[in-house]
Amino acid sequence: MCGILALMLADPHQQACPEIYEGLYSLQHRGQDAAGIVTAGNKGRLYQCKGSGMVADVFSQHQLRQLVGSMGIGHLRYPTAGSCAHSEAQPFYVNSPYGLVLGHNGNLINGPELRRFLDTEAHRHVNTGSDSELLLNIFAYELQRLDKFRINENDIFEALRNVYDRVNGGYACVAMIAGLGVLGFRDPNGIRPLVIGERDTPEGKDYMLASESVVLTQFGYRTFRDIRPGECVFIRRSNREDILAGFRGPRLFSRQILPCLRFTPDIFEYVYFARPDSVIDGLSVYQSRLNMGEKLAHTIMKRFGPDYMEKIDAVIPVPDSARTSALALAQTAQLPYVEAFIKNRYIGRTFIMPGQQIRRKSVRRKLNVQPQEFFDKNVLIVDDSIVRGTTSREIVQMARESGAKNVYLASCAPMITHPHVYGIDLADCKDLIAYGKTEDEVAEAISADGVIYQTLEDLLDSCRTAELTEFEVGLFTGEYTTGASKEYLVHLEQMRIANNRARKHSFAEDEEREAPEDISLHNTHSDVTFDFV
């Protein structure tokens, strides 16, 4: 899972970089492994800065000042099953044709097939194991096949039609063509989210594309909508013909490249990944989590029986993503709600940290307890999900160390028994704590007195609207929207093993080693001075 963002300002003399930079801060929860920004100057030159780490670590004020131009794209990487190399920081760039950059959120399930095609037929070199580089080169190949000196919006849509025919998976992308404009597109099942907004200015309309609506509202984009599954939007920089025709500012073009196939957004966005103040595909993430808490409350009351209030002294959330659901659960069941875990806000989200050992250590760094809220009490701890069990074991142990009599754990999500194939590095089946186990066996594995899972039907009901009736739930059922062959799942596991092996070297003796310098063209990590054009 990653965060993506694209911006086109109406005023060609304004700089897009500051807003992209701040926007990435708002999406930081979507990826903490690497960050990158690429902008385009008015004469078409691209300026890039990217590297490993969080937004605050990657960009200095000196580097930001060199990212000039009124349009650009940004990316935050979440470590998936691919390599952890510094070279895989996005956006990716190819010079031919036209100068293209692309940032991608998701996963392609026919990656090995695409890699062979690019090698044997398209004769394009792919330098990393990233699906994003595959997508970029497929797009570049299809544009190259048009064999045009200059392209327009119709050419872009035609090329993307062929891209859709070749790739399979869940993806949302933003891209930029040097000197021409920015675009965004989404897979035909709508698995990964993408939203577009517009903002009125004296020079015309500014446009922004982002993974979540929270970025748009932060910057005053009052009119926004979700990109439809299979749709592409292209925002062209204003040119001389536009000015002569009386148009002001960038021009927006939209086309439904493919008809929507099923419209199955990934339900894990609502469970965990997205910010609660975002709206995805018309559904408030906050409201969906309230619904999850209410549904889970009824399951718990049924599980514990009529005297459940005598068996549970306090409902305690695991901050932050479980807070909303835990509060709704407590209110529905008329149980005391207590903030007994105190979060260190300077530690990243443990779920998306690269490596099991790092996650385990980070739980204790991230959370501390209020002992008086546990001592001599029966506590119900509410978490958004239970994946590997790393966090769950630690928080149960912390509760017991603080004197809790009985510790029960409730999950807002059902049992996760299968890998996620669309860009979230959950784990292989054998590493998922619920794989092949009952609720009682999971409770024993994490040393809890009981574990209560949300039912799949209740989770679906929590997120359904008039427009949203189906969701991607393969991690619970093993049935994926696009299908996933056994060969691909084996390939995914092999990539994850190689990735974990690389990370063991990277984090030897608990110290993160400095990554090699990125020597990509125009990378502002150096002290080279660029022309501000």
From Swiss-Prot:
The keyword Transferase applies. Pfam families: GATase_7. Mg(2+) binds at D383, D384. Residues 2-238 form the Glutamine amidotransferase type-2 domain. Binds 1 Mg(2+) ion per subunit. Coiled coil: none annotated. The modification Phosphoserine is found at S506. Pathway: Purine metabolism; IMP biosynthesis via de novo pathway; N(1)-(5-phospho-D-ribosyl)glycinamide from 5-phospho-alpha-D-ribose 1-diphosphate: step 1/2. One of its GO terms (cellular component) is cytoplasm. Its cofactor is Mg(2+). Its EC number is 2.4.2.14. The active site is at C2 (nucleophile). In the C-terminal section; belongs to the purine/pyrimidine phosphoribosyltransferase family. This is Amidophosphoribosyltransferase. It comes from Schizosaccharomyces pombe (strain 972 / ATCC 24843).
